[in-house]
Each structure stands twice: as structure tokens, then as C-alpha cells.
Amino acid sequence: MIKRLPDDFIFGGATAAYQAEGATTIDGKGAVAWDRYLKDNYWYTAEPASDFYHQYPVDLALAEQFGINGIRISIAWSRIFPEGFGEVNAKGVAFYHSLFAECHKHHVEPFVTLHHFDTPEALHSRGDFLNRENIDHFVAYAAYCFKEFPEVTYWTTFNEIGPIGDGQYLVGKFPPGISYDLAKVFQSHHNMMLAHARALVHYKEQAYPGEIGIVHALPTKYPLDPKKPGDVLAAELDDIIHNKFILDATYLGQYSEKTMAGVKHILAENGGSLDLRPEDFELLQAAKDLNDFLGINYYMSDWLRAFDGETEIIHNGKGEKGGSKYQIKGVGQRVFDVDVPRTDWDWMIYPQGLYDQIMRIKADYPGYKKIYITENGLGYKDTCIDGRIDDDARIDYIKQHLAVIADAISTGANVKGYFIWSLMDVFSWSNGYDKRYGLFYVDFETQKRYPKKSAYWYQQLAATKTISM
């Protein structure tokens, strides 16, 4: 069976500043919370990462050679404003001008994100987005970038508001490492959506000629047994935490009655309250129809069952399959032993979940305009033997997910592009350097790049726009 993607479809690769650039302390870059947090809590740091700060001409030349016509890049906020606000770092500004020029030189369209998990330490230490002053600082930073970088046509404000709150305040694997505080999770989500809305309104008021949107991670949630009301409720509540709360803010400008009922139930079980103000919803209402596109990051789905017990989450960071546990008081318990393939990190491989999520957006949020799949890929323990990397599992993963994207398009969804995570191997926030995603293998000691088998497959796909199943 042959499936075809549109002629104007973007075949992209994704990166992120902190995961790729390295160079964390040079040319005036300010600190981020991750710098110390990784040293204190993990077995790796963000040095050298992929040394994208110096190697970007190599990576962009490879992108062009292999038919990749789009790249996701994030600007490191602390490279522009080392303290998060105030004095501008001219060397940081010059770096991004050079980077974007190199993108255009190689006919690779940059899709630029303003915040990818890396709030400057000077602001993070004051509460990050739990502190409403951070909204003001983010909007000022965004406004500066919109004006300074007219060579950028496609902007996204935030990458994955959901996992930021989840990582910082629920699982506790991101700085500041707070666990099981659901009120902080929701408040962080809400305040970041306010920052998005203000930046979005500013961009449109200035009548910039480009497009702007937001990237959400949207793992699809299913009841373990659809016939059991408790399992159905568990899936709905977990969906509210990770998906529906932020989607409502993005496209409804408010939280639906069902969403708020779920939030109130979760907080009644776990404690805490939210600061939601009337003027917040005036802002969300003003922004809800201004998003030019939605970026969907999709890697996995989850199956949930009813659970009556205390919260316990164990993050599988070392790729030891079966090491995960996820159960939240008053919400539910994720079940990993289902008839679905999973990675060594217990991520469930389920392409149908991406199709279902796209169609959910189309049905529930018809004002979405268009979608890009801004991250999707397979984390794998790749091995390089004499410069050859056979990653057939990754090819199969990408193929299956692109096939359901083609199905969604044929069903009427407006999906305009796909960005594999990641363009080249980068370091993983909570898994280090062993979990590789790239089309190009990076020898982190020499920084030499090697195209994987998947890179050659992706090159052919970009040329033909066809998927052979």
C-alpha cells in the first residue's frame, strides 16, 4: 500500500537550544537552572551536547543534502538576556542572526521557539512561571525577538507547557525538583498560557508578516477497559492534567465546565488552590483565535485504570524497561503491561494515538487552522560500527506515524508538516546521552556526524512524498 503526503508538506528535523548548543558559559550566556541541577542530580551535563553552537553549518549542510526543508530551533533566552531582562547580550543576538542566515543559505526554513524548558536562572530562582512577574519578562523578551529577527517567519512561544509543569512539580525530574504538587502544575500551565496569549496578541498588534503558534505535547489517554466507568474517568482526568487544560486555554479562552470539574476534583483529592483572575480570561479570550498553527509533539499514548491509593511516580531515566510507575491519588494508574510495543524507557508505541489526537483537535477545537507535528521520534540505544548505524526500528516508527498523518489529512485534517525529533543526536533532559533520536549520529567526543540508515530513508521520503507500507 502506498500513502502520499502533500507536495507542500514540510519534512523537518527538530532541535532545542539547551539540548543541542553546548557552549553554556561562553560569549555572555547567562545561567539556567539546569546548569546546576544536572550537576547535582544527574550523571551528565549539557556540555558538550551536540556543539550546535559551533557545528550548525555542518548540521544545516547535512539537512539540505538529505532533503530536509524545515528545522525547529529554539532561542536560548539567557543568551539574549543573561539575567532574563535588562541588558542585551550582543554576542548572543549575533549568533542567532548567523544561524538563521545559514538556515536560509541551505534552503531550510527555521521554525523558531522562544522557550524550550530553559528559563534563565535569575528568573527561575524567583519562582519561574509561578511568579506572575515572569510573564512580563517573557513578553518583553518575545517582543524583542520579534523585532530583532525579521528573518524568522514562523514563531512558537513555548515548547511543551504540559511537560514543564509535569517535570517541575509532579514528577520532580526538572528543576526545582518538586514532586506531587498538582496545584503548582495547573498554576504553571495557566500562567504560561497567559504569557503565550500576551506574546501572541503583541505579535498580531504589531502586524508582523509571519505566523505564530504554540507547541503542545499531547499524549493520548485511553481507559484500560472502556466498559469500566472508573477506567474511563481515570483517562479523562489524566487527559485534563496533560492535555485538555492547556488546549482549552489555547482555543476556547476559558476552561470548560467539564475541565474545571476535573481540576476541582483533582485538587480536592491532592490539596491546593489556583489563582485564576477575571482579567486572565479576558486575555485568553482575546488570544484564542489568533494562533496561526498548533504544533503537536507526540511520542506515546497511555492506558489508565481506576486507582484508590497514594501518589507514586517512578521515572525510568536509564532505559531499563519495566522500571516506570505512575499513579496519582484521585486520578488513576497508568498500566504499562498492555499489548502494545514499548521502548526501553516504557514509552508506548501507538501510532493510532497520533491519529486520534489530530482528529480530536479537529473535532473539539475547530478553530485550530493548521497543525504541524513538531516532534515525533524513537529514542534508541544506537550503535555506530565503522560509521554505519542500522536503525530499522526508527524507520518503522517514523513510517507508521507518517502513515496515520496521511490518513488524518485524507480525513480532512489540515496537517502541514512533520519534524522528526531529532535532526541529530542531542542530550536528553532526564536520560542523558544514551537515548538517541537523531537522523544523524553524533560522536559526542569528536562531534563528528554520521548519517544513520534512517537519514537515507527520510531523504527518499522527502523526495517522493510517498510512504510504502
From Swiss-Prot:
D-galactose 6-phosphate binds at residues 19, 116, 159-160, 297, 428-429, 435, 437. Pathway: Carbohydrate metabolism; lactose degradation; D-galactose 6-phosphate and beta-D-glucose from lactose 6-phosphate: step 1/1. GO terms for molecular function: 6-phospho-beta-galactosidase activity; beta-glucosidase activity. GO terms for biological process: lactose catabolic process via tagatose-6-phosphate. Its EC number is 3.2.1.85. GO terms for cellular component: cytosol. InterPro entries: 6P-beta-galactosidase (IPR005928), Glyco_hydro_1 (IPR001360), Glyco_hydro_1_AS (IPR018120), Glyco_hydro_1_N_CS (IPR033132), Glycoside_hydrolase_SF (IPR017853). It holds the Pfam family Glyco_hydro_1. It catalyses: a 6-phospho-beta-D-galactoside + H2O = D-galactose 6-phosphate + an alcohol. PROSITE patterns: GLYCOSYL_HYDROL_F1_1, GLYCOSYL_HYDROL_F1_2. The active site is at residues 160, 375. Keywords: Glycosidase, Hydrolase. It comes from the Bacteria. SUPFAM superfamilies: (Trans)glycosidases. Belongs to the glycosyl hydrolase 1 family. This is 6-phospho-beta-galactosidase. It comes from Streptococcus equi subsp. zooepidemicus (strain H70).
